[in-house]
């Protein structure tokens, strides 16, 4: 009997335990739901507020980030509820703070650089912070209100925890495992949701699955946090790095861009008849013989045959693309500067509005004489190495989630370990011309001391080889004064410069701007009141470029080489340090998002009596093929992603880093998918116009992907080897050179990592010493 009672008691206890567990699970699910909603609200708030700070508005395409908020919120819910009330009371604000700090970092980075921080740039974080700390301080002070708003969820959470008796329940371990599966499930549900909405090139799904998408474009569609997750997956785990349709090279020809009118367009034909013409008068037709120009093609490259003879899929796709690519053609300006000298300048932060008739008259003269590219656009918003790479190689730099990281981040530094026979300097070396490269900062930065010689700039000098009054930024004039004697006595020369004086921020903290400020104010005279301090400081920084150009022209004239020397100069990127108010003040008008890319590329030669205007749309990658044509230097234009601006039988487009583009028919903004047409669209059906945009998007994607493949697969070496242009000895020598370059690069990475470590330790030691001293003083008192 007692045994039966004991069994019944045990059964009752089990039932109570089950009931208790069931209640705990139900309570836990309720707590999990609350934490989930809190994190979802925090992430949504931060995304919307950051988007407003970036673009000033939210449009439909920006809302795709909501597809991933459930997964992101569930991920953070995994770490909530681990403890009992007090522990969770501490954990929750910490988790919210982590989210808030992430968005604060993105906001500050955007305020400095004009774009969002990518995963591939993380390896450069320490170096960037070190070099830009003096700029960061001002941005942090100016952003204090916005940063406080970003931190508002954390502040509110802490406040409620202190003044309200709110319970912070935990939940069983089972409910910490469940959110892991829910996070994965919700993430894939978000992907499928985007897929249902649309998969074309303008869709969020395309941006998600296309690993060549840049950070800003991805964040514009998917949100900042989802972009970080997607980029981390691609970078650290290779997620999506395989072949897929969204990143396939597409062959698009000129025929695909023929806009056919939906309805016939009547043409008015005017006939002129002489009243007294007799019946016997012979009608004479004036026949204008059209000159047929040859394409810029190297007959040694048979890309169609190479495609047929390879079994490698990536190589076959590249060869097919190159075989079908429209070449540039020789034209009336071919050889205009044959035999001349070339000075090729990539100028830091240089923009059209740096050319001011009163402040920088030499720059203004050079801008409006020589060859004037009226529709030149600088493709890049920031990051010097990207604009520099495109300007010197006519390849697009990798700004995608494929991009490698490290201090040597970017295609230009990575090109040091690749075979680069089509760098600008290489062409002049092949023609027996001495080549030089000069930069007024350290050659280790962006690994220029490795990459420049590899694209043909054989004799390079950097900071250390030259002496400067200031380190950051240093003087362009001082660089010019120390460099010209190296080459000026040569019969022929090609000199490349990467300047530095124009670097921001454009405040009194800038050494170059500060030393030129009084001079610029005096030169502006009565117009001074029209400019705010930021605009004046920008002109003051560019005044150093003015001084360096004055010196350059004077020395060339003294040497009797001014008339047969071509000076090419453009900016590395838009001067992103300019705020909207500074930009408006400098331009004396408001500038649209696309207009800020409209810039100047000088092709100046004092020997030209009259300026030559070219109204074709063009950008950074188009300059190398244009120069090669002007100098009549043989090349295969299919291997360059730019087009000679004077090639009359070619399509001309200014493409931006985010795949926006402009030409004589349309301006397409990829950030909002808006197309502003310059033609009468009423005679075309909507389908034809839409097809035109999508074909251009496909072509631009292909140019970009082909450029990435050139670096990723070292494809120039593959082409030269399979075309029989290199001997076994030359191949072995190149492999040895590339391996040594990468060894040096790795050694430099270790040196800089060690320097960062020592710097950090020194800072921690100094802080500890200061704290100990303060404590000691407190005891003494």
Question: What are these regions, as identified by a protein language model?
Answer:
Residues 43, 47, 88, 92, ...:
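Long, solvent-exposed N-terminal ectodomains of secreted or membrane-tethered precursors processed
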Residues 97-104, 151, 681, 688-692:
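Hydrophobic alpha-helical transmembrane segments of multipass integral membrane proteins
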Residues 100, 202, 206, 573-576:
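Alpha-helical scaffold segments in carbohydrate-active enzymes
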Residues 141, 244, 338:
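Catalytic cores of glycan-processing enzymes that make or break glycosidic bonds
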């Amino acid at each position: 009997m007692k045994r039966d009672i004991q069994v019944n008691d045990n059964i009752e206890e089990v039932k109570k335990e089950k009931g208790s567990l069931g209640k705990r699970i139900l309570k836990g699910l309720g707590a999990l739901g609350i934490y989930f909603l809190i994190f979802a609200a925090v992430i949504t708030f931060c995304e919307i507020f950051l988007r407003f700070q970036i673009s000033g508005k939210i449009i439909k395409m920006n809302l795709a980030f909501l597809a991933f908020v459930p997964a992101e919120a569930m991920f953070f819910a995994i770490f909530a509820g681990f403890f009992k009330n007090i522990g969770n009371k501490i954990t929750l604000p910490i988790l919210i703070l982590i989210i808030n700090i992430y968005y604060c970092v993105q906001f500050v980075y955007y305020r400095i650089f004009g774009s969002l921080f990518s995963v591939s740039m993380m390896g450069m974080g320490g170096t960037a912070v070190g070099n830009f700390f003096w700029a960061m301080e001002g941005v942090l002070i100016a952003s204090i209100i916005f940063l406080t708003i970003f931190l508002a969820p954390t502040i509110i959470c802490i406040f409620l925890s202190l003044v309200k008796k709110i319970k912070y329940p935990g939940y069983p371990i089972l409910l910490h495992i469940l959110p892991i599966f829910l996070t994965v499930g919700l993430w894939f549900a978000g992907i499928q949701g985007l897929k249902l909405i649309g998969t074309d090139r303008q869709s969020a799904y395309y941006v998600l699955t296309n690993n060549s998408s840049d950070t800003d474009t991805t964040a514009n569609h998917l949100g900042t946090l989802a972009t970080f997750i997607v980029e981390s997956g691609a970078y650290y785990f290779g997620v999506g790095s395989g072949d897929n349709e969204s990143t396939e090279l597409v062959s698009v020809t000129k025929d695909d861009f023929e806009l056919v009118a939906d309805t016939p367009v009547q043409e008015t034909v005017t006939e002129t008849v002489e009243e007294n013409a007799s019946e016997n008068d012979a009608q004479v037709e004036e026949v204008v013989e059209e000159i047929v120009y040859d394409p810029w093609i190297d007959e040694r490259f048979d890309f169609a045959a190479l495609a047929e003879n390879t079994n490698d899929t990536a190589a076959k796709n590249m060869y097919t693309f190159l075989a079908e690519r429209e070449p540039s053609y020789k034209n009336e300006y071919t050889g205009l500067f044959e035999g001349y000298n070339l000075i090729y300048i990539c100028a830091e932060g240089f923009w059209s509005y740096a050319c001011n008739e009163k402040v920088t008259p030499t720059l203004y003269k050079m801008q409006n004489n020589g060859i004037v590219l009226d529709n030149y656009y600088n493709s890049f918003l920031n990051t010097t190495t990207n604009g520099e790479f495109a300007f010197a190689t006519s390849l697009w730099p990798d700004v995608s989630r494929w991009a490698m990281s490290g201090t040597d981040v970017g295609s230009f530094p990575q090109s040091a370990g690749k075979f680069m026979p089509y760098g600008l300097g290489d062409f002049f070396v092949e023609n027996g011309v001495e080549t030089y490269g000069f930069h007024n900062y350290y050659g280790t930065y962006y690994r220029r001391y490795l990459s420049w010689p590899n694209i043909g700039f054989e004799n390079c000098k950097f900071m250390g080889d030259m002496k400067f009054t200031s380190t950051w930024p240093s003087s362009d004039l001082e660089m010019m004064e120390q460099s010209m004697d190296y080459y000026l006595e040569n019969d022929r020369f090609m000199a490349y410069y990467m300047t530095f004086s124009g670097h921001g921020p454009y405040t009194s903290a800038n050494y170059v701007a500060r030393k030129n400020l009084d001079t610029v104010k005096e030169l502006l005279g009565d117009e001074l009141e029209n400019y705010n301090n930021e605009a004046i400081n920008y002109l003051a920084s560019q005044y150093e470029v003015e001084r360096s150009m004055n010196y350059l022209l004077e020395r060339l004239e003294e040497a009797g080489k001014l008339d047969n020397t071509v000076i090419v100069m453009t900016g590395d990127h838009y001067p992103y340090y300019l705020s909207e108010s500074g930009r408006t003040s400098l331009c004396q008008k408001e500038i649209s998002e696309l207009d800020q890319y409209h810039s100047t590329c000088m092709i100046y030669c004092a020997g030209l009596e009259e300026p030559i205007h070219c109204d074709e749309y063009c950008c950074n990658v188009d300059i190398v093929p244009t120069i090669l044509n002007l100098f009549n230097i043989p090349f295969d234009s299919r291997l360059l992603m730019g087009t000679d601006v004077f090639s009359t039988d070619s399509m001309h487009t200014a493409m931006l880093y985010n795949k926006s583009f402009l030409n004589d028919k349309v301006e397409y903004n990829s950030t909002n998918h808006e197309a502003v047409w310059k033609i009468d669209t009423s005679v075309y059906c909507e389908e034809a116009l839409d097809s035109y945009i999508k074909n251009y998007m496909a072509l631009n994607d292909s140019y970009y992907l082909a450029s990435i493949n050139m670096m990723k697969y070292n494809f120039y070496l593959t082409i030269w080897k399979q075309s029989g242009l290199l001997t076994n000895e030359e191949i072995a020598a190149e492999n040895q050179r590339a391996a040594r370059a990468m060894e040096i690069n790795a050694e430099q990475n270790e040196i800089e990592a060690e320097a960062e470590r020592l710097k950090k330790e020194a800072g921690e030691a100094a802080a500890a010493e200061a704290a100990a001293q303060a404590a000691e003083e407190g005891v003494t008192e």
